[in-house]
Amino acid sequence: MTRRTSNLITLAGALLLVVLGGGYVARAAIARSVFVTQARAALGTDVDVSSADYGGGVWDVRGLQIGSHASPVRLDAPHATIEGAGGATHVAIDRPVVTIGVAYDPLAAAAGLPAQLAAFERAYPHADVRFHAGRIVLPGGDRSFDSIEGTFRVAGHPDAPSDVDATFDGTLQLTDGNAVYPIAARASADGRSFASLQAAALPAAAFATFEPADALVKPVSGMLRDLDWEETRGTARLDGVTFDVGDHRLHGLHGVIAFESGGVGAKKLAGFLDGVPFDAAGEVHDVPHVGWLYDGSRELRSDASLLARIAAEPELRSVHFDTTAPGLGFAQYAMQSEHGPLAISVLTIDALEPTLRFDTAIAEDHVISNGERTSAMGVRTAAVAGVNGDYFDIGRTYQPQGMLVRGGELVRGPVDRAALVIDSSKHVRFDEFHIAGTVRAAGKSFAITQLNDWPAGAVTVITPAFGKTLPAAPGVTFAALEPAGGAHRFRVTRVAAATAPQPVTFGVAFGPNAHISLRPGETVEVRYRLDPDVPGAVAAIGGGPILVRDGAWYEDPHAPAPDERDYRWPVIALARVSDERLLLVAADGRHPERSVGMTRPEFADLLIRLGATDAMALDSGGSVTMVSRAPGDATVSVRNVPSDNSAERWVSDALFIYSSAAAPTLVPAAVAVTPPPEARPAP
C-alpha cells in the first residue's frame, strides 16, 4: 500500500511538473533568450520568438530538451510545431490552447517516474491544465494507467518570479467510468514533494495500476475514503476493500489505515480471510506485520507468513492481529479441532529488529518469593510482551525448578532437563545445560553443584538474588563471603549452621555430604559458568520438554512430568522459525466452550505447521499466560484466557520482550461496520 501510494504521488508530482513546466521545472523560469538558444541549437538557424504571445513566463518548452536530439528539429513560427526525431517530441502551438504530445517525457524523468505520458494541454494563458492519461506505461511496459482509469485534471496558476520557489495549489481529478474523484493537492515548485494530498474517496483498484507485476498484495475492489496525506504520513478509511494476498483473499475490510515512512498501520480493521472473520488492530511500523501488507522485499514477512500458513487450516474460524512494537506482532486464532474448539495466541518476534531485546524477570526479584503474576512482572519491568516461564514450587517457596539468566547474570543454576538461552543477537539455543564451577580453599577444590537452590545440596552458591532470608534447613551450613580483591577471590566472614532463618548475603552453602570446612578469615576462590557456554547470553529460562527439533516432533527423554505427555490442556512454547523469526505460541485449554487444549504431540504438530524448526515448552497447565501491550495501552495485559477459573496464576519467573522504540501514535478509531459472517469457501 505504501509503495502504491508513493507511486501515485510520484505520478501526481510528474503532472505538477508538467503544470509548473509552464514556468518552474528547475525552480526558475528560463528566459526567452534561453529558449531561443535551445531552438537555435536544435535547428541550426535563428528563431524569432519576440512576440509577447510566447513570453511572460507563462509557458516555455525548456523541459522538453529540444537541443538534446541528435536528429534535426523543425520549428514553424509563430503558431506551428516543434518536431524532433529520436524522442519523437513535438509541440503544437495554437493559441489559445497549447497541446504537447510526448513519447518520452523528460519532465516525468526529472520527477523520478520512468513513464510515457500520452498528452497534456494547457489553455493559454491562465486556465486549467488537463492531463489526458491515454496511457502511462510503468517500468517494464507490462503495467499501465489506461484511459479507462480516468483523467487527471490540474487547476492552478503558479505564476511567480523566476528567482523564487513556486508552490502549487490545485486539484487532480481521477475519473473511473462515470465517477469523478477530485484530489486536492499542494506541491512545491519542483513537483517532487507534496505538502499535502486529500481526497474524499478513491477506488482502491486504481492503485493496482502502480503495483509491480510480482507484488503479492493486489487491491481488487472497494474504496479508500478520507485520504489525508501530509509529507511522509497519512491516513485513510477502508470501505469494503478487498485485497488478494498470495493465494488468499482478504475482503470486505473496514477500518482506518495509517501510512508512515515505509510502514502501514491500522487502529482497527475488520473483514474476512477466505470467508473467515478477520480483524486487526494497532499500528504497524516500518516492518510490516499484518498479512495483507506489501513489503518492499516483495515477500510476506512476520505475521504475514503466519497468516498464509494459518489460512490453510481447514478448521479456521476467525483471525485477529494487532501490533505491540516495531518487529513484534500479536495474533489470535479461533480454530476447530476434532476434539473441540481451540484458541491459539501467537507473538511473532523479528530477531533483526534492533529496538527489541529479550530478558527474564523473577517474582518479587528473588528466587524465593511469594510468587507474582506474569502481567505484574511485565508492568513492573516495562516489558511490551512476554509469557510465563519455568516450572516452580507452587504455593510454597515459588522458586523455579530450572535455570534462569537475567540481564546476562546467572541467577539460578540448571537442572538435568531442557532450557533455552538467548544471546544479544536474539539467537536461541535449546539444550540441556549444567553448572561448571569450583570453590577452592586451603589447597582443596570442591565442585559447585548448584546456584541459588534451597535446601542446598552438596555445594551451592548463594547470591543476593536468592531472597531476603535463608530459611532454616537441617544439616546445611552457610559461609558468608565478602570480596577480597580480584574478580573471584573472597574472604569468609562467618560460618553458621542453617538451624534458623538468617539474612541472605553472597556465600556458599553446603550439605552434610559436602565434606567441606571453612573458617572465618579464610580466603576462597569461587568460579562458575554455564556448560556448554553461550557467549553473549543475556537471558535464559528453564522449562521443557523440547517439542520440535530440526522441523520434526521430538520425544524428549528428559521431559518433565512425562505422564502429562497426552494431557489435553493449556500449553505454551518458544519456537524458532529461522535466525530472523521467533514465535511464542500459547494454546488455551480447560474451556470446553472456547478451547479444549492440546497434547504435547498435537501442539508440536501445530508449531511445525507454523514453520517451527525447533521449539521448547514452558510451564503449562494453569500457568500458561501470554501478555502484550494492546493498541492504545501503555502497559502489558493478559491476552489469552488462563485456565485457573480464567484468572492469572502467581508464578516464579517469566520471559519478556522489551522495546526501545517510542510507543506507537494511534490513528483515530475507525467507524467500522463489520460485514455479516459468511460461509468459508469449499477447498
Model-derived regions, located:
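Elongated, acidic membrane-bridging lipid-handling scaffolds
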Residues: 73, 77-78, 84, 111-206
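Hydrophobic residues on conserved beta-strands that form the core of alpha/beta folds
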Residues: 47-49, 61, 75-77, 88, ...
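Generic short beta-strand segments
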Residues: 62-66, 94-98, 132-137, 169-171, ...
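Gly/Ser/Thr/Pro-rich low-complexity, intrinsically disordered segments
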Residues: 301-683
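Strand-loop-strand
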Residues: 167-172, 254, 260-276, 281-304, ...
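Hydrophobic membrane-insertion alpha-helices, especially the h-region
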Residues: 9-24
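Terminal hydrophobic membrane-targeting helix
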Residues: 20-102
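Broad, structure-driven detector of short, well-ordered beta-strand segments within folded domains
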Residues: 75, 80-82, 150-152, 183-189, ...
